[in-house]
Regions:
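Polybasic, lysine-rich low-complexity intrinsically disordered segments
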Residues: 11-13, 24, 39, 45, ...
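Short, low-complexity, charge-dense intrinsically disordered segments
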Residues: 4-9, 17, 31
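N-terminal polybasic/positive-inside topogenic patches
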Residues: 7-8, 42, 68, 72, ...
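Short N-terminal alpha-helical targeting/association segments
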Residues: 3-5, 15, 45, 49
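Intrinsic-disorder-associated interaction segments
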Residues: 15-18, 84
């Protein structure tokens, strides 16, 4: 099968050089045999002469004496004849081997895919009762990733056994067969021959337990709802029942699995009306039973049918030249353009997940879902009154408790009683109390040991400086506040300066913050506004924002006890600025203060930027916003779609950009997922199907009709992460070899 190398399988006309070489070798061997024969005859005459002489001398022992030399002569003759013959065979083998090694095209490759020659029960058989299927091929085959690529429909709750056995495939169904039902075993492209991996192609075996077999098909694509990425390996199924509860209680009727492009084909469908669903089936029961499972659903009803249609089939002479284009009749199964948008529901069940005390000065509590009523902590081995600075996350699902008192920070174990709201088995919110032991990952003894080592190293360093007569310090430096300042040298006019502190602040003195702008050669005071940084995850969500600020300000004011701030200035193009912060402008809850800081930066000229405007049509006044994306599909700017259908982006640096539009039905400025029990689809997302190249001083306008192009053809390939796998095809190595030799390629070999 593999690389045809045996001489019997080679065609003489393709190997004239090798045949001529072998003939020369045979002629040479014949000459050698003649010489050996002459030598043998001479030796025979010598032996016979010696024998006659011995007969005359010893008459009594003639028989014995004559037999011995005669047998010896026969042995010598055999050796003399076998030696050249063995040498000849060895030379032929060496030459044949050399011909193969030195000739990379020593034989044609097997490029014929395997063929199905039969099956029991017969393919498309009816009134079948057997649960074991055997499919026979004309050569040895293998199945690649059967657990991923082979799908049995109707779905099997107990996994069938599927294996390749030489020239056949054995399938054993474990579930009981349903009456009057069409069964399909979709192998997709999993079947190849054993040696060269020539693909059989998409192959589906089917049979019916009733008197007729169903042959209709439906096809489509599954995409991630929030970014239109193809979803690979998810189940897509049909329900003939229209009730929404079927997806929650009953396994799918017929199923398929999506490929790397997100495409699916459900085969063996009976005429009728259906609803289509997709499911990342975590527990293998073919229904939506876990809220963490990714799903997709369509509220539309489909009716599978088939029509006679025509399609173009292109025949290629080689990889570059078209040989012919033919019009071919085929049966077109519809619908074949279903698009499902997959999403994960927001987890609303609340329960305690875990605790952390990685740093000695804070405790983190993690919950599955946020709650506007924060947990209550009661200290069991300390007084919890005024012991914490409480910092909730944006979604209120992670609560950080900063320990105010250093005595508590230095305590390795804190025992607390935690009371919080959780969801019970009936879905009701109830109060739950747990006892927790909070252990510091960095024990006090280790921290003191590290501090002592740090001081010893510092003292040694100062001693060396003193010994060399250089300047040294006599007082161990006071630790400064943990602060990160984000102020790039070139600050875009629509950006601000960000401050991030490692620990909540106890004091902010804005009188020690100074911003200067340079006009000509002089520096002038420039106005600014210093405030806590708004959480982007809460943008537009008034309810979440209210809960966040209620929790965040329960024991602190708007500046103190926070960790993130921004400085907003009146940034003017082509102007230099200097930010100067006096020492002790900031102090954290442990008394650490900020040092003197001076940071210079410039706002570039408007000539360094371009602008981009989208004229958006077909959205009928629905609230929308556009996100400008980088080459990694990450949003870098956001702009609302105005009432006149435009979205504008200013201060764009030179580069390549992409864009997506989000239909913001609740007008909260962010994408929201769906909820199946309420029949709520995730918010729609559309991609501009081209990249936009921006240049300095350019004003670019693009017209965009988001609903005009099919959803599965919108996202540009350049930013699509789930790439389509290369389709399995014959490698065409014989064609390449024939082109290299300047001869016609062989016809397909009959197996």
């Amino acid at each position: 099968m593999a690389f045809q190398r045996s001489r019997a399988q080679r065609k003489k006309k393709h190997y004239p050089e090798i045949i001529i070489m072998i003939k020369k070798i045979i002629d040479h061997i014949t000459l050698m045999l003649c010489r050996y024969e002459q030598k043998r005859q001479t030796q025979q005459k010598r032996v016979m002469s010696q024998t006659r002489q011995r007969r005359e001398k010893q008459h009594q022992h003639n028989a014995f004496r004559q037999a011995t030399p005669t047998e010896s002569w026969q042995r010598e003759r055999s050796v003399a004849m076998l030696a050249p013959l063995g040498l000849a065979l060895l030379l032929v083998a060496v030459v044949a081997s050399c011909a193969r090694m030195g000739q990379p095209d020593g034989g044609w490759y097997d490029e014929t895919p395997p063929k199905v020659i039969g099956a029991t029960p017969a393919d498309r058989g009816v009134n079948v009762s057997a649960k074991k299927v055997n499919i026979f091929f004309d050569e040895y085959i293998k199945i690649e990733n059967p657990s991923e690529k082979v799908v049995v429909s109707p779905p099997q709750l107990e996994q069938p056994e599927i294996k390749a056995a030489g020239k056949r495939i054995d399938v054993k169904l474990a579930d009981s067969l349903k009456a009057n039902t069409t069964y399909t075993i979709d192998f997709s492209d999993a079947i190849t021959d054993n040696n060269e991996s020539n693909p059989l192609g998409n192959y589906t075996y089917s049979f019916s337990t009733g008197p007729q077999i169903d042959t209709l098909e439906v096809a489509g694509t599954v995409l991630q709802a929030d970014n239109l990425e193809p979803v690979k390996g998810t189940l897509v199924g049909l329900y003939s029942e229209m009730a929404d509860s079927c997806f929650l209680k009953v396994p799918m009727l017929r199923v398929a699995r999506t490929d790397s492009r997100g495409r699916f084909i459900i085969r063996g469908v009976a005429p009728g009306a259906y609803r289509v669903y997709a499911l990342a089936d975590a527990d293998g029961n073919y229904m939506f039973s876990q809220k963490s499972e990714q799903i997709a659903f369509s509220t539309d009803t489909i009716k599978p049918h088939v029509i006679d249609d025509m399609r173009q089939d292109t025949l290629w002479r080689d990889s570059l030249r078209i040989k012919d284009i033919k019009q071919i009749k085929y049966r077109h199964f519809l619908p074949d353009d279903i698009v499902l948008r997959a999403f994960n529901e927001e987890v609303t069940d609340r329960y305690f997940v875990k605790q952390e005390r990685k740093e000695a000065n804070n405790i983190k509590l993690f919950f599955s879902h946020g709650d506007k009523q924060l947990p209550v902590i009661r200290g069991l081995n300390f007084d919890e009154k005024n012991a914490f600075v409480v910092e909730p996350s944006a979604r209120l699902d992670t609560i950080t408790y900063w320990l105010r008192d250093t005595a508590l920070v230095n305590r390795d174990t804190l025992n607390v009683e935690l009371t919080y709201n959780m969801t019970d088995t009936l879905g009701h919110i109830v109060s739950q109390t747990d006892t927790l032991e909070l252990l510091s990952k960095q024990p006090y003894e280790r921290r003191m040991k590290d501090l002592k080592k740090e001081m010893d190293d510092w003292q040694k360093k100062q001693a060396k400086l003193k010994k060399r007569g250089e300047r040294y310090d006599s007082v161990f430096p006071r630790k400064e506040i943990d602060m990160k300042l984000e102020a790039p040298a070139d600050l875009d006019p629509d950006r601000n300066i960000k401050f991030t502190f490692g620990v909540p602040l106890a004091r902010v003195d804005t009188s020690k913050i100074h911003l200067y702008a340079k006009h000509d050669t002089l520096w002038y005071n420039s106005r600014f506004f210093f405030r806590p940084l708004e959480n982007e995850k809460l943008k537009g969500d008034s309810a979440a924002t209210a809960c966040y600020w209620a929790a965040a300000t329960a024991s602190r004011d708007r500046l103190e006890m926070q960790r993130e701030f921004e400085l907003i200035g009146e940034w003017r193009p082509d102007i230099e600025y200097s930010l100067e912060i006096d020492s002790a402008a900031f102090a954290d809850i442990y008394g650490l203060e900020s040092p003197t800081i001076k940071k210079g930066f410039k706002v570039p000229s408007l000539d360094a930027y371009g602008t981009l405007l989208f004229n958006i049509s077909g959205m009928d006044g629905t609230p929308c916003f556009v996100e400008l994306l980088n080459s990694n599909d990450k949003p870098i700017k956001q702009a609302p779609v105005t009432s006149d259908g435009t979205a504008q982006f200013f201060y764009l640096k030179e580069g390549e950009y992409y864009a997506r539009l989000i239909v913001d039905r609740n007008n909260n400025g962010r994408w929201d997922t769906g909820l199946y029990e309420e029949g709520l689809q995730p918010e729609e997302v559309f991609y501009f199907n081209e990249k936009v190249e921006c240049k300095a001083k350019w004003d670019i306008t693009r017209n965009w009709s988001p609903r005009q192009r099919p959803l599965d053809h919108q996202k540009p390939d350049a930013i699509t992460k789930q790439k389509a796998e290369k389709q399995k095809t014959i490698q065409q190595r014989n064609l390449q070899r024939a082109q290299k030799m300047g001869i016609e390629p062989p016809k397909e070999r009959e197996k």
